[in-house]
């Protein structure tokens, strides 16, 4: 297969075991793509080609494999909604539709290689087409969650210098309000059944677009995508990934952690605005020729998730720990998952108790993985490996992972320190390039020969890594990364608030939630405090993305601060996690 030869990173195409087709309840913890962890880590090597484009070198090669009959009749993409509607594409159909989309970007929108395209769409087929169209045209994809507010959209359009935005009816009005303030924005595409003034209607344009398009020959180190991520100070930062860092780097996830082959059907529940969707809804499964399954749910519903797992031949399932916590509260034993054989979790640490309950009710282990928007899989629990509940597992083949002290010294097993990835003398291919337009932040992540993840942990005597805490104050709630600065910025706009500090607080379902410690202005200290809490919560929901609002609020007289005036969030968080 040409893609395998050119990229020199994928092993021989795995032919599915026919037992998995004949017997729907076939399950095994034996890896499909490797013999054991040690051999996988030892044997893994990759040469990065000078030119690489995932659409041309992977997707189009799977199309060729389909045409020659070497890939079983498994869809490349399978989408369903709650109303019984389904969309199925082969790799050939995906290619044809994405080439039409690519022509719209280059011809109707006049976009050129390197131009930036913001895509804010829910889990609808056009989101996947937008991903592939950007690859084909060499334009830079910038995903955004559909929960963004007008203020969020303005900041992202301005800071990214996006020339085009693609969204739907829900967010188009917000875009229209801020568009005049975005000097680089000149094209707007809407996915809608209706026309809108000043917008190109993508559905109509697709009807007449040509599917003849020549894929841009991108260099492996060209910028492919920018992901916004929350931090503790300042607004969200832009993380740059290249055609190789995700396009090739995520082969590690697909082949080893997800253990996918071409007959698999992979369902990842992540929001389209996050890098996890690139991980498990685009690059990882399609690298392996597997089917990407998507279910459009307006909101998370555990019953719908279980029904979907039971109804469709999903073999690999990926979701956040919050989802598993909610799923096990149902009577899972009343469902039959005849095809499901592999379950993974990422985004935040998963409780051992949840893993135990899931195994008890389904017979399946949950294989936890650890990574960041900046990386591909850093550590993981892999099939064929002993699972230590609560552990992140062992380093993926992509990285050399160590625990460092503040001086950059590698610590022995059992000692807590900073989780770090070696980047010198040879920089790993699955790592981001830089924080866009933020060289000081990029430089701050380096310590000697290592990239510092910002997370604390330790390694045990068996080489398993254990997560302890985040070095920064980012809150992980239901799989969302929430920066305290964003919430505090919204809070301070309320007239009752003099100052505030936001930290994480434990929650049995979401893992952790946002808690705000608030110092009130004198005029509001006699107000009904419960009513005021509700008003503040509603204010935050309207000011920033709704998932960021503080589910817990505590009014205090003053915030603990250092001598230099910095809020001591660590003290507040420690108190919260100790006393709650």
Curated annotation (Swiss-Prot):
This protein's UniProt keywords: Acetylation, ATP-binding, Fatty acid metabolism, Ligase, Lipid metabolism, Magnesium, Metal-binding, Mitochondrion, Nucleotide-binding, Transit peptide
Coiled-coil positions: none
EC annotation from Swiss-Prot or TrEMBL: 6.2.1.2, 6.2.1.17
Gene Ontology annotations for the cellular component aspect, listed alphabetically: mitochondrial matrix; mitochondrion
Annotated PROSITE patterns: AMP_BINDING
Matching InterPro entries: AMP-bd_C (IPR025110), AMP-bd_C_sf (IPR045851), AMP-binding_CS (IPR020845), AMP-dep_synth/lig_dom (IPR000873), ANL_N_sf (IPR042099), Mitochondrial_ACSM (IPR051087)
Record: transit peptide: 1-21
One annotated GO biological process: acyl-CoA metabolic process
Single GO MF descriptor: fatty-acyl-CoA synthase activity
Residues binding ATP, per UniProt: 229-237, 368-373, 455, 470, 566
Entry superkingdom: Eukaryota
Cofactor field: Mg(2+); Mn(2+)
Residues with N6-succinyllysine modification: 67, 100
Family note: Belongs to the ATP-dependent AMP-binding enzyme family.
Stated name of the protein: Acyl-coenzyme A synthetase ACSM3, mitochondrial
UniProt source species: Rattus norvegicus
Gene that this sequence comes from: Acsm3
């Amino acid at each position: 297969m040409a893609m395998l030869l050119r990229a020199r990173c994928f092993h021989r195409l795995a032919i599915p075991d026919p037992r998995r087709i004949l017997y729907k309840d076939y399950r095994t913890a034996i890896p499909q793509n490797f013999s054991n962890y040690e051999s996988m880590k030892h044997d893994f090597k990759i040469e990065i080609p000078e030119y690489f484009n995932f659409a041309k070198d992977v997707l189009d090669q799977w199309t060729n494999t389909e045409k020659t009959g070497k890939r079983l009749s498994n869809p490349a993409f399978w989408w369903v909604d709650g109303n019984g509607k389904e969309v199925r594409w082969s790799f050939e159909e995906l290619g044809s539709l994405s080439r039409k989309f690519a022509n719209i970007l280059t011809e109707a929108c006049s976009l050129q290689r390197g131009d930036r395209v913001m895509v804010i769409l829910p889990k609808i087929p056009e989101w996947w087409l937008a991903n592939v169209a950007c690859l084909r045209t060499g334009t830079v994809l910038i995903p955004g969650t559909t929960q963004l507010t007008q203020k969020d959209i303005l900041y992202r359009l301005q800071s990214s210098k996006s020339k085009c935005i693609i969204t739907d009816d829900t967010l188009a009005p917000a875009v229209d309000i801020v568009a005049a303030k975005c000097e680089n924005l000149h094209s707007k595409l809407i996915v809608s059944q209706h026309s809108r003034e000043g917008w190109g209607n993508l559905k109509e344009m697709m009807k007449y677009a040509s599917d003849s398009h020549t894929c841009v020959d991108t260099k492996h180190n060209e910028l492919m995508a920018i992901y916004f991520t929350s931090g503790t100070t300042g607004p969200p930062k832009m993380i740059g990934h290249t055609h190789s860092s995700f396009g090739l780097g995520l082969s590690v996830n697909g082949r080893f952690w997800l253990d996918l082959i071409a007959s698999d059907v992979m369902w990842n529940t992540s929001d389209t605005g996050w890098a996890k969707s690139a991980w498990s809804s685009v690059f990882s499964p399609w690298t392996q020729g597997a089917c990407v399954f998507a279910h459009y749910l307006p909101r998370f519903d555990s019953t719908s998730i279980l029904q979907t797992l039971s109804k469709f031949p999903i073999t690999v399932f990926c979701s956040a720990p919050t989802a598993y916590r909610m799923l096990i509260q149902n009577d899972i034993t009343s469902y039959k998952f005849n095809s499901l054989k592999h379950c993974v979790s990422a985004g935040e640490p998963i409780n051992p108790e949840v893993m135990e309950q899931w195994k008890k009710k389904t017979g399946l282990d949950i294989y936890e993985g650890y990574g960041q928007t900046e990386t591909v899989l850093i550590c993981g629990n892999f099939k064929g490996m002993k699972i230590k509940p609560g552990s992140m597992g062992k380093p993926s083949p992509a990285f050399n992972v160590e625990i460092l002290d503040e001086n950059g010294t590698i610590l022995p097993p059992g000692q807590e320190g900073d989780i770090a990835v070696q980047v010198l003398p040879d920089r790993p291919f699955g790592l981001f390039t830089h924080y866009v337009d933020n060289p000081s932040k990029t430089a701050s992540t380096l310590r000697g020969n290592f990239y510092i993840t910002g997370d604390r942990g330790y390694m045990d005597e068996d080489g398993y890594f254990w997560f302890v805490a985040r070095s920064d104050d980012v809150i992980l709630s239901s799989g969302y990364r929430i920066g305290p600065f964003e919430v505090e910025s919204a809070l301070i706009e309320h007239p009752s608030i003099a100052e505030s500090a936001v930290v994480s607080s434990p929650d049995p379902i979401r893992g952790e939630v946002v808690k705000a410690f608030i110092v009130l202005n004198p005029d509001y200290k006699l107000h009904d405090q419960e009513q005021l809490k509700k008003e503040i919560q509603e204010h935050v929901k309207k000011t920033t993305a709704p998932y960021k609002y503080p589910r817990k609020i505590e009014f205090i007289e003053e915030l603990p601060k250092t001598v230099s005036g910095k809020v001591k969030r660590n003290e507040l968080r420690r108190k919260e996690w100790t006393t709650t």
